[in-house]
Curated annotation (Swiss-Prot):
It comes from Triticum kiharae. Residues 35-77 form the Chitin-binding type-1 domain. It comes from the Eukaryota. GO terms for molecular function: chitin binding. This is Antimicrobial peptide 1b. Keywords: Antibiotic, Antimicrobial, Chitin-binding, Disulfide bond, Fungicide, Plant defense, Signal. Residues 93-105 have a biased composition (Low complexity). Residues 1-34 form the signal peptide.
Length: 116
């Protein structure tokens, strides 16, 4: 006489396989999304590839990430990285020559932002 297997024993491997698949999917989703986190939610991390950092801390493009009220940083993509930064002057360049010439005349060419 063969021993009778209960339904519980037969279901255990199937439940374990489903549980393993769910855990692996969660780990994979966290790893993929973890690289795309930004801003305050990710300790100030910046988005790659000129993406905007949305208000919920995810990188993306379009109004949902870059629009007014939807963006927390890099709202203009890569253009934010250079806005307000002075470009270095090469010796002999027009910019370097103009700056040294103005300085010799007592003029200050420091750029400022804001209104009058």
């Amino acid at each position: 006489m063969k021993p009778h297997m209960s339904a519980t024993v037969l279901r255990a491997p199937r439940v374990a396989a489903i549980l393993l698949a769910v855990v692996l999917a969660a780990v994979l989703a966290t790893a993929v999304n973890g690289a795309q986190r930004c801003g305050d939610q990710a300790r100030g991390a910046k988005c790659p590839n000129c993406l905007c950092c949305g208000k919920y801390g995810f990188c993306g493009s379009g109004d949902a990430y870059c629009g007014a009220g939807s963006c927390q940083s890099q709202c203009r993509g890569c253009r934010d990285d250079v806005v307000g930064q002075a470009l270095p002057a090469e010796p002999g360049s027009t910019r370097a020559t103009a700056a040294s010439s103005a300085s010799a005349r007592g003029l200050n060419l420091t750029a400022t932002t804001g209104g009058p």
